């Protein structure tokens, strides 16, 4: 036995960052213009643009999906509820009522292993719109909260 010998070992640890899929920005508030964009349904467009930014830096990327849910129907401070009034309209004109069940609003493509930033926006007659089924009370403001879910 040789007690004077000190053994040194070098160990290399490689940490690989596999990237991430992130929801970076979402328009925080938007309002609706009360002039209908549809003859047969009372659909109203947003006053301001709804823009969502998603960054995909995943090394092994795959298609991803963005869903929207609401915590409750549009409601005024006085408790007046506009049932089934927040809707999502896709590029084919198909209408889905927003609820606590996730509604698919966008499908993103794989990034091919490279950083990809996707800016999501919709035309005036697409995306999140206001559908009037009941009458509106004068001088009332209606609110609901949209939750966005990003899924790989």
Question: Where do the model's predicted regions map?
Answer:
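N-terminal small/polar-rich segments of proteins
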Residues: 3-89, 109-152
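Carboxylate/His-rich catalytic cores and anion/metal-binding grooves
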Residues: 85, 94-96
């Amino acid at each position: 036995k040789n007690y004077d010998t000190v053994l040194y070992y070098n160990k290399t640890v490689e940490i690989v960052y596999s990237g991430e899929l992130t929801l970076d920005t979402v328009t925080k508030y938007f309002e609706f213009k009360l002039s209908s964009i549809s003859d047969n349904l009372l659909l109203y467009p947003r006053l301001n643009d709804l823009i969502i930014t998603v960054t995909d830096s995943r090394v092994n990327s795959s298609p991803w999906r963005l869903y929207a849910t609401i915590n409750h129907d549009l409601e005024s401070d006085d408790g007046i509820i506009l049932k089934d009034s927040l809707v999502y309209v896709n590029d084919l004109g198909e209408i889905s009522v927003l609820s606590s069940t996730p509604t698919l609003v966008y499908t993103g493509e794989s990034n091919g292993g490279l950083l990809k930033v996707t800016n999501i926006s919709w035309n005036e007659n697409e995306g999140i719109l206001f559908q009037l089924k009941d009458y509106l009370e004068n001088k009332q403001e209606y609110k609901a909260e949209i939750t966005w879910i990003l899924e790989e």
